[in-house]
Amino acid sequence: LKYEFENIFPGCRLLDIHEYLFEKGLTLPDKGQKYLYHEPCHTPMKQYSSIKVAETLLSAEVKMSDRCCGEAGTFSVSRPDIAAQVRYRKEHELKSNLLEFDETPAKILTSCPACQQGLSRYESATALETDYIVVEMVKQHLGDEWSKAFTHQVLNGGMENILL
């Protein structure tokens, strides 16, 4: 399957939200936090290095955590026998990654919903919470209750009141 966006939308680029924010120069203040980054097997970031994007947006040290998380859409359901072995290797990779830090990183971040679900399976073994880069940025900027406030605004004032 080949995407032909250039034929449908001439002159337009397809960018992941993280790359868009990176190009716009958006960054958080440096809080001395450290993160692991799990790059999805089918990463949405195509224009820039995902580590460079994450480090720049978060103003933080970000280290890559290799290996598939074992979720891969329907893979974990269709082939649980193989997925279990992939998850076993990923768990060992995460534990190895943690040894590279002086202190436990704040979280493991990703840019894929299936990977976020897969990575959440390791929280009890690693004490690492999983999130999207952009959600981590919003939480740091607006606080942990941002989602409730956003939902309240949408339900009571419409999207245009939030955007404008």
Label every PLM stretch briefly:
Residues L1-L164:
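Iron-sulfur cluster-binding electron-transfer modules in prokaryotic oxidoreductases
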